[in-house]
Curated annotation (Swiss-Prot):
Official protein name in the record: Ubiquitin carboxyl-terminal hydrolase 1
USP domain: residues covered: 81-784
GO CC field: cytosol; nucleoplasm; nucleus
UniProt keyword annotations, A-Z: Autocatalytic cleavage, DNA damage, DNA repair, Hydrolase, Nucleus, Phosphoprotein, Protease, Thiol protease, Ubl conjugation, Ubl conjugation pathway
Gene (name only): Usp1
Amino acid sequence: MPGVIPSESNGLSRGSPSKKNRLSLKFFQKKETKRALDFTDSQEDEEKASEYRGSEIDQVVPAAQSSPVSCEKRENLLPFVGLNNLGNTCYLNSILQVLYFCPGFKAGVKHLFNIISRKKEALKDDSIQKDKGSCKEDPLASYELICSLQSLIISVEQLQASFLLNPEKYTDELATQPRRLLNTLRELNPMYEGYLQHDAQEVLQCILGNIQETCQLLKKEEIKNLTEFSSKVEEKSLQKEETGGISSTETDSTRNLDDLKEQLPKGNWKRKSDGESGNMKKKVKLSRESQPLEENQRQTRSKRKATGDTLEASPKIIPKCVSENESAKPSQKKSKVKINWLKPATKQPSILSKFCSLGKITTNQRSKGQPKVNEGDLEEDLEKDGRDNTVNGSGPASPGSSVTPVDSSEAKSINKGAEQIGFELVEKLFQGQLVLRTRCLECESLTERREDFQDISVPVQEDELSKVEESSEISPEPKTEMKTLRWAISQFASVERIVGEDKYFCENCHHYTEAERSLLFDKMPEVITIHLKCFAASGLEFDCYGGGLSKINTPLLTPLKLSLEEWSTKPTNDSYGLFAVVMHSGITISSGHYTASVKVTDLNSLELDKGNFVVDQMCEIGKPEPLNEEEARGTAENYDDEVSIRVGGNAQPSKVLNKKNVEGIGLLGGQKSKADYELCSKASNPEKVVGTPFTDSRNSETNDTNGTQESDRSKESSDQTGINVSGLENKISYVVQSLKEYEGKWLLFDDSEVKVTEEKDFLNSLSPSTSPTSTPYLLFYKKL
């Protein structure tokens, strides 16, 4: 018995510390032994502690969204739209703000989007005729970036105009989300997946590179269409030359019959002049074939009936069937050879053309499953022939088929130059040309090699300092004289002497010689992008976050005006003015925060955009959203909710991520509070929160496509704003006038926050006297 007692005491002594340790882990702030042994009190304390923690969490969120802050935001709200940070996307937001204010960029994107929308409609028509499989998905994927940019531009313009029209409806910050563009970049380059910080210069090159590829693709397709169109014109001109004598001898009462003759293969009418019996058999055969196609061709026949033709029923049926044969003729490569056969002889080619037409009729009998497409081709051929008749003077075309096609041909000739400019958007705005000139020091011969460039990377300090710092264990901040931007450009375009082992092989001297190599500007773009090399490789052990790239905070004197005549191949008087700067604050390339400073100028260009604002918000809002089968599953609102956070494609993981990892995500990207990131899941579109009349029309337009319904919606939107269309134009002029108040001022875009910066403060931040952590990273100069 006495031995049992110590064993129990030992058991208690061994058991009680384990209980204390287990409870002390839950309540490490209160380590009292009495409460640790009392289980009832511990459960009550646990419930109280959980309630207390819940109250603390509940109290943190309203503190960030207090009412005085919102009141200050409402008072200081500027009529310029910011971009929400979607998780370390400050690098993208700063570049998008610069591109938005870049002169000519919005007009070029809009022009490309209009071309793409027509291409998409043509692809839909082709899908009815032929199933091309995956061939149609590649161009759509390349068009996605242009459509995403246009959608973002429209949303920014709408939000800006609606704020100026109804400022009292905005209770939160004026910002929108570039979610669709971000997901497009992630599809084009998987490097942008996740929520890591990236380089602003790299994302700029990615955007411009994809736009350039899209322009090249559109240009190739346009050239292909022009060659096909020219081949059609050549074939029809050759056919008209054959029947020129016959049509000139016809009387005025049979001019409509002349038009029908030109629709037919020319050999048939020559065969009719030789013998009438053959054509009678042909008419009977054609009339039999046209009966099953009569229902599908009522629309075309009604157009021709409305013209007032005095022909009988059988002549109306003949040109329709044969013109269908002509519509298939340009797609065959052997048609040109057959037309060349028709040239030398006058009688015999009519027999060959007769057999050719019979062969095409048999093919039309086999392909009866495509009457609608053939009908569309028939209308196009009739319209083109009508235009040719009016030009050549062979006879007036019918009014129903000649009025509108002439306008379309004139539009093509007028817009041809605009399309060429639109296809060269990147080349005209951002791309220049460098000349790498090498001069042999023995024979004085020159060799030149040209390269395209979209930005200029210049140093911010001398290279010798880095060599000195490598030898020393301690790397103090270099104390040198203030360098200027002209010095940096001179280092970029400096003359390099090639000596020693790196001698130049001269083709004139036929041996290795010493040479001088220089870099000059041959062609300058409208916008010069200067990349300051603020990040340098460092072998420091504590630099574990930057990947060996540390920040160089050496200040560089940056002028507001710049001339590159000193480094040009030919004399020029072009001068450039600074209009945008991307700033970086931080110590490494993979951390920190990006902001953009933009100077508000050229509001006349904004006035042109606002003049088209009524058209955009009535007609083009719903077009950019559904691009392929995956995105066509829902509207833009559902699209944003589906891919707000790429965890599993569902909405629940996004909520969990918002609750747990908001603080960790927002530190590097520059989020000031949780509300800036939670806006991604709570409100997928800030326009939806505001509830402006423009957004109501946008949501309704994505579901309907009829012109009558669009006109009704335009009337409803005008009723909601209390003004008509002319009143909207007056409001738009008021919008532009209110924006002119900020002309010449510098705006600081810090994600969703927009502030006005005085020019003195901006110059101090641009060329500081000390070495701050916030330094310029990208400089944008436009041609004055």
